[in-house]
Amino acid sequence: MQKSEGFRSKTRYKLQKHPRQKGMAPLTRALKCYTEGDRVHVVLDPSVQKGMPHPKFHGKTGVVVAQRGRSFLVRVKDGGKYKDIIARPQHLRESKL
């Protein structure tokens, strides 16, 4: 039988939560607002499927370019070029630098 290559394939450990982190994230994370030029880390939250960018961007750092409804357009460097990804605030963390 042919192996499926879905959106979440090969993410057995990448989209796994530690026991103390299980369940829904706090509401303040979903209501977080970022402004243009903010540096953010893409950290996927497996308990929220909506607005999740592709798992290959997990751990990348980018710059917020614009807001699209509830989501944000983030420019991330992938290899030698920049890519724009759309992600909800649950999957973004503010960079401390």
From Swiss-Prot:
SUPFAM superfamilies in the cross-refs: Translation proteins SH3-like domain
Alphabetical list of InterPro entries matching this protein: Ribosomal_eL21 (IPR001147), Ribosomal_eL21_arc (IPR022856), Ribosomal_eL21_CS (IPR018259), Ribosomal_eL21_sf (IPR036948), Translation_prot_SH3-like_sf (IPR008991)
Superkingdom of source: Archaea
> Where is this chain compositionally biased, Basic residues type?
9-21
Segments of this protein annotated with the region Disordered: 1-26
For this UniProt entry, what's an example GO CC term? ribosome
Q: Which GO terms describe its molecular function?
A: structural constituent of ribosome
Q: Which GO terms describe its biological process?
A: translation
Q: What are the UniProt keywords, alphabetically? A: Ribonucleoprotein, Ribosomal protein
| Family annotation (Gene3D superfamilies) | Ribosomal protein L21 (2.30.30.70)
Entries under PROSITE patterns matching the protein: RIBOSOMAL_L21E
Task: Kindly give the HAMAP family that the UniProt entry links to this protein.
Answer: Ribosomal_eL21
The UniProt similarity line reads: Belongs to the eukaryotic ribosomal protein eL21 family.
Protein name per its UniProtKB record: Large ribosomal subunit protein eL21
Q: Taxonomic lineage per UniProt?
A: Archaea, Methanobacteriati, Methanobacteriota, Methanomada group, Methanococci
Gene assigned in the entry = rpl21e
